[in-house]
Amino acid sequence: PFFKRVGSDLYVTKEIKVTEALLGTDVEVPSIEGPKRVTIPPGIKSHGKVRLKGLGVPDTNKGINGDQYVEVIIDIPKRLTDRQKTLLEELKREGI
């Protein structure tokens, strides 16, 4: 897995679908302790972050671990089926 380290905090990205961003979802992400389940809240925006407290790198000066952040990237499909287009048009009429 690819982690970005900033101080004692770790950052990882996770791609999710548009529907998962709108409705919320549970996803598995890597951590230095192994895979972890993370709840992505409904309505999260692309590049929004979810914090995993204490799952970063140990900070020897403070005696605590940093945090891990999961940056959410929303995957916008380039192609839609006719059914998907119809459903999205219905949602558009509903104001979503």
Q: Where does each model-flagged region fall?
A:
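Intrinsically disordered, low-complexity linker/assembly segments
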Residues: 1-96
